[in-house]
């Protein structure tokens, strides 16, 4: 086998990207082999199968397929066998087991796997964006965010941002500090996607005090001083009033999930 090129044909009713990644992961376990991968995408009719097999027969190899339509899968198996080709079904056994486990039949809709894969990558991109734009990082990217959260330190900006990111939204957050102007970019983006966060001062004092304790800091300073916290929150309220397009949410008695749900409902409807 070493030194000779082998051909592997991937038949998919969608793009074939997912099955190719699975194949490449498997091939990584084989050293000193040469394989050329041919992706046959959007195989959804009898004609598609017969046409693709004509190409396969020019340089025969193994056929690996993920066709959720049972009739098309059977046709491919029969045609492959008739031409002396090895054919491996990557999805039927999985669908059968899941159908038995859940007690329901699969939808057999081509492309669903690709749609799920696309959604997964959307979430990955959203998380990556959100991490890179946490706590005021790179304000130049605010225009690319789906939502921009603003608020004082420890007002749930980061956990709320990450929760939304895992739902596929690109989120940036900007800390509001009295005496320091927010970045100019904040006022240049679509003002309807900005969310101002508020929190009860007593609750914020409690959160910040615990934070300092966990960091081993005995001195509270202005960070955990009630009057200073009131000043910070008053500054936020004044800023929010000057920007009436911003959505304002009080996170005091809300879970991250509840706050995220309101943002999505009010800004995406």
UniProtKB/Swiss-Prot annotation:
One of its GO terms (molecular function) is ADP binding. ADP binds at residues 151-158. Belongs to the pyruvate, phosphate/water dikinase regulatory protein family. PDRP subfamily. InterPro entries: Kinase-pyrophosphorylase, PPDK_reg. It catalyses: N(tele)-phospho-L-histidyl/L-threonyl-[pyruvate, phosphate dikinase] + ADP = N(tele)-phospho-L-histidyl/O-phospho-L-threonyl-[pyruvate, phosphate dikinase] + AMP + H(+); N(tele)-phospho-L-histidyl/O-phospho-L-threonyl-[pyruvate, phosphate dikinase] + phosphate + H(+) = N(tele)-phospho-L-histidyl/L-threonyl-[pyruvate, phosphate dikinase] + diphosphate. Its EC number is 2.7.11.32, 2.7.4.27. Signal peptide: none annotated. It is an enzyme of class 2 (transferase). The keyword tRNA-binding does not apply. Bifunctional serine/threonine kinase and phosphorylase involved in the regulation of the pyruvate, phosphate dikinase (PPDK) by catalyzing its phosphorylation/dephosphorylation. Keywords: Kinase, Nucleotide-binding, Serine/threonine-protein kinase, Transferase. This is Putative pyruvate, phosphate dikinase regulatory protein.
């Amino acid at each position: 086998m070493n030194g000779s090129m082998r051909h592997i044909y991937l038949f998919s009713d969608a793009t074939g990207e997912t099955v190719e990644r699975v194949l490449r992961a498997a091939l990584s376990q084989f050293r000193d082999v040469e394989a050329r991968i041919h992706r046959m995408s959007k195989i959804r009719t009898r004609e598609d199968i017969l046409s693709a097999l004509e190409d396969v027969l020019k340089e025969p190899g193994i056929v690996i397929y993920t066709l959720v339509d049972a009739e098309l899968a059977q046709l491919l198996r029969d045609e492959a066998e008739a031409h002396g080709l090895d054919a491996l079904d990557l999805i039927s056994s999985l669908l059968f087991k899941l159908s038995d486990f859940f007690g329901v039949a699969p939808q057999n809709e081509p492309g669903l796997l690709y749609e799920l894969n696309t959604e997964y990558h959307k979430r990955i991109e959203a998380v990556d964006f959100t991490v890179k734009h946490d706590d005021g990082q790179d304000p130049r990217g605010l225009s690319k965010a789906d939502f921009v959260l603003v608020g004082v330190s420890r007002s749930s900006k980061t956990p709320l941002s990450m929760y939304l990111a895992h739902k596929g939204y690109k989120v940036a957050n900007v800390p509001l500090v009295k005496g320091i102007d927010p970045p100019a970019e904040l006022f240049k983006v679509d003002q309807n996607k900005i969310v101002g966060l508020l929190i009860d001062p007593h609750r914020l004092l409690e959160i910040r005090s615990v934070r300092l304790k966990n960091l081993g800091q005995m001195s509270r300073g202005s960070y955990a001083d009630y009057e200073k916290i009131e000043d910070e929150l008053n500054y936020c309220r004044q800023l929010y009033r000057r920007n009436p397009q911003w959505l304002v949410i009080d996170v005091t008695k809300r879970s991250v999930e509840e706050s995220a749900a309101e943002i999505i409902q009010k800004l995406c409807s």
